[in-house]
UniProtKB/Swiss-Prot annotation:
Belongs to the universal ribosomal protein uL24 family. This is Large ribosomal subunit protein uL24. The lineage of its organism: Bacteria, Bacillati, Bacillota, Bacilli, Lactobacillales. One of its GO terms (biological process) is translation. The keyword Ribosomal protein applies. One of its GO terms (molecular function) is rRNA binding. InterPro entries: KOW, Rib_uL2_dom2, Ribosomal_uL24, Ribosomal_uL24_CS, Ribosomal_uL24_KOW, Translation_prot_SH3-like_sf. Keywords: Ribonucleoprotein, Ribosomal protein, RNA-binding, rRNA-binding.
Length: 101
């Protein structure tokens, strides 16, 4: 999967299209990511020891990895490629050519 935790991404599809935020969690088995402040859903929480009152909480839900593009340091969104630099495999932005790792 080309997106990692901590990457700055731009959402390119869906109700939050155009939003730029940081990846909180990458879920490679299901090809999804959880992005900060994107795809907020309301969850009905049952009372527990940590939250004795229960209630409705808002949290980020996962979105498909194809709906985000990784941003480089200059804020250019592009597809991600892989190349070898000094014998080490690194990710790079195909549009700007800048190394991401």
């Amino acid at each position: 999967m080309f997106v990692k935790k901590g990457d700055k991404v731009r959402v390119i599809a869906g109700k939050d299209k155009g939003t730029e935020a940081v990846v909180l969690t990458a879920l490679p088995k299901v090809n999804k990511v959880i992005v900060e402040g994107v795809n907020i859903v309301k969850k009905h929480q049952r009372p527990t020891n940590e939250l004795p009152q229960g209630g409705i909480i808002e949290k980020e839900a996962a979105i498909h990895v194809s709906n985000v593009q990784v941003l480089d340091k200059n804020g250019v969104a592009g597809r991600v490629g892989y190349k070898f630099v000094d014998g080490k495999k690194v990710r790079y932005n195909k549009k700007s050519g800048e190394v991401l790792d």
